[in-house]
Amino acid sequence: MKKKDFDVITILIGIIVGAFIGYFIGHSTENTQPVINPTQETGYVYLLQLAKYDNPDGAINFQTLAKNKGFDVEIVYDGVYYIYGAIGISEESLSQIKLSYEAKGYSCIVRKEYMLDLPNSIIDDQYAYDFYLECINNLINSLSNEQIIISDKYYIEPVNLELFSTLTILQTIQNSSLKARAQLQAYRLLVQNLK
């Protein structure tokens, strides 16, 4: 064998070995990459929408009819009047509630909404911005059954007393149905004040 033939064989063997090593390394890293669970997305909430109206009278009538059937719903104005029956941290967390509404004849859809950009409308007022961002994080924590922590400065001077009161209720309440109502009310107050 000549030196030239030996170099060609060595190069070919190197290419083949390199391809095998690259293939196996690629497969091992492909299998170890974390699977992103959509319920772990930060800043999103899921809302069970029962209806949507262009006028407040239709929304109020719907709310009255729902209350007569034993459901507490919130009217949230965001360009149109949305009627929400529940709020959750994932679509799965709303599945049982959705079934109970559908059993009473309501047609429901689940809406996904990103919350963390809501305070951007008041970014010039740092104190209010921090308050509302903390409220959003506390609402998300409440939906995740995590601890709600309210800064001491807001006990002295809350930006929005109604929202602050709702969050302090969420911080201590044990009744799950009242907690669900307070969570939906907190969402309504956030949208009402930030959009």
Where do the protein language model's features map onto the residues?
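Acidic/polar low-complexity segments and flexible, solvent-exposed patches
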Residues: 1-195
